[in-house]
From Swiss-Prot:
Protein name: GDSL esterase/lipase At2g31540
Keywords, sorted A to Z: Glycoprotein, Hydrolase, Lipid degradation, Lipid metabolism, Secreted, Signal
GO BP: any one term: lipid catabolic process
Record organism: Arabidopsis thaliana
UniProt subcellular location: Secreted
A cellular component annotation (GO) from this entry: extracellular region
Domain of life assignment: Eukaryota
Molecular function terms, GO-annotated: hydrolase activity, acting on ester bonds
Signal peptide range in chain numbering: 1-23
Glycosylation sites: N104, N326
Active-site residue numbers: S42, D334, H337
The keyword Secreted belongs to this UniProt entry's keyword annotation: yes
Amino acid sequence: MSTSKAITLTLFIATTLLAPCNAAANATTKPLFPAILIFGDSTVDTGNNNYPLPTIFRAEHFPYGMDLPDGKANGRFSNGKLISDIIATKLNIKEFIPPFLQPNLSDQDILTGVCFASAGAGYDDLTSLSTQAIRVSEQPNMFKSYIARLKGIVGDKKAMEIINNAFVVVSAGPNDFILNYYEIPSRRLEYPFISGYQDFILKRLENFVRELYSLGVRNVLVGGLPPMGCLPIHMTAKFRNIFRFCLEHHNKDSVLYNEKLQNLLPQIEASLPGSKFLYADVYNPMMEMIQNPSKYGFKETKRGCCGTGFLETSFMCNVFSPVCQNRSEFLFFDSIHPSEATYNVIGNLLDPLIRGKFQA
C-alpha cells in the first residue's frame, strides 16, 4: 500500500471512530434552553442596581466580585458567581447573565437572556419603598421592553418561541420578612401572625408568575426561603450571645413558608396549560452545610467573609473592609449573601432536578 493511501485510510478510520465522540460532545454542550431570564432580589441581581437607582443596595465595589475572572465588582452580591450564573453555565446557555439595564447589551446578550432582578426587592411593594429597589411587581415591565427588543432582532414568531422555551428563575422573599416583619414590624398590625403574612407574600408571588405566563413564560424555577434564622446579620440583630446560635423560630417560619410554596406551585402549574414549575430548595442544603460544614469544605458558617462578618453588607462591605483569605471556607461572603462556594453546592444539587423536570 502506498504511503498516501495509508495516510488516507488512517484518517478515515480516525474520523469514523471520533464521529460518535464528537456527536456526544455536541449533545452535551447544546443548551437545554435557548435563553435564561432572571427575576427577583440580590440573590440573583447581576448588576441592575448599578444603574441610576436611588438605592444604597449596591455591589459595584470591592471586595464584591473579587473572585470573578477579571477580579472586578459588577453588581453581584458575592465574591464570584451567583446561583443564576452557575445554573446558566450548567445548562450551557452562557457563563454570566448580564443585567437588563446594562447599556451596552449585544444582540447575543438579548437572544440568550438577561437579568431583571434588583437587590433589595421583594414581592411586597412595601419592601422596595424602604430599599428603593426595582419592585418585583415592576420587573415584568422591564421584561416587556426586553420582548420588544427581542422581536426587533428575530421577529415576533421567533421571539415568542424563545420566550416560550426559555428557562426562568424567580428568587425573592427574604427582604419581605426581614424588612416588613422581623426588623421593622410594618406589616405586623395587618398580619399579627406570621402565617398570614406568608399567605400574602405567596399570593403576590402567584400573581407575579401568572403575569409572566401571560407574557409567554412557561418554564419556571421558584426559589424558597433560606434558613432565615441563620443569616449572620439576623443573628447579630436578634441574638446577643457570643455563641451565635441560629434563631430556630425564624427557621421554623422559613420551613412553613417553603411547605406552602411547594404545595402552591403544582396548583399553579395545573391551572396554566403548558407550564412547568419547579421548587428550588435552598433551605435544606444550607442547613446541611451549617450542620456538617467540613463535608463541604467550610470552616465558618456563622459570619461572613467581609469585615467582621456580623453586619457588613452592601455599602458597609467595602474597599476598607478586611476580607478573609480562604473564601471557599466561608458559607457567607457578607452578612447576608452566600459565597460562590455555597452557590456551587446548591447549583450541583439543582442541576439534575432541573434536567429531570424540564427534559421530561
